[in-house]
């Protein structure tokens, strides 16, 4: 099989996986991907431009998206980089430590990280070669949820498996983290990111609850 044939086969498989995912789930995955992207590194000029084109509805989440849009329009890449560094890097450590282990145990690289790594192996997830952060950081977990929903590393996983991963690795602490991000002293643009993240987590919790009740 030629390289071109393999590429075309991969593209057909990718299209099939996308067709197996509902529009609602694609929207969920898009939000998880967005949060992962904006929390992984400082928003650059391109991302800020994209964020300034966002649009929200009259829901609480939609209003938070509109606020993020307005803040993005007046934000500059250099100021966002400074804000990001104060929040997550700092001198010695940033204002926030966005890791499941820290939020759940008070320490880094603890049992929550070990449990996540085991589940990643079972689900066929792996850390990118150019990522050196512990896998239980909030950006990576957002990206993992998106990958599970759309089947980026295979077939889309069932809602039950999504719920299990969410309940174990995200629900216990992500809402708390996003609330802290909203209120952090250094947060300007990222305060709006925190609002979007917190409200989205609340929606996911409720949606998973309703789904579990229907299947009970």
Predicted features by range, described:
Residues 2-216:
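Surface/interface-facing alpha-helical segments and adjacent flexible terminal/loop regions used
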């Amino acid at each position: 099989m030629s390289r071109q044939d393999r590429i075309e086969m991969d593209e057909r498989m990718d299209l099939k996986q996308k067709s197996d995912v509902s529009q609602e789930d694609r929207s969920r995955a898009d939000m998880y991907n967005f949060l992962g992207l904006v929390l992984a590194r400082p928003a650059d000029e391109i991302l800020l431009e994209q964020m300034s084109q966002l649009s929200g509805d009259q829901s609480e989440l939609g209003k938070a998206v509109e606020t993020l849009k307005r803040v993005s329009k007046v934000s500059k890449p250099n100021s966002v980089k400074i804000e990001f560094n104060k929040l997550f890097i700092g001198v010695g450590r940033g204002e926030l430590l966005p890791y499941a282990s820290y939020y759940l145990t008070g320490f880094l690289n603890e049992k929550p990280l070990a449990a996540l790594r085991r589940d990643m192996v079972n689900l066929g997830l792996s850390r990118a070669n150019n990522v050196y952060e512990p896998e239980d950081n909030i950006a990576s977990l957002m990206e993992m949820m998106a990958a599970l929903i759309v089947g980026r590393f295979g077939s889309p996983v069932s809602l039950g498996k999504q719920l299990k991963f969410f309940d174990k690795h995200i629900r216990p602490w992500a809402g708390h983290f996003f609330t802290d991000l909203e209120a952090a002293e250094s947060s300007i643009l990222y305060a709006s990111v925190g609002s979007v993240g917190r409200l989205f987590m609340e929606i996911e919790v409720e949606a998973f609850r309703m789904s579990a009740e229907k299947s009970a």
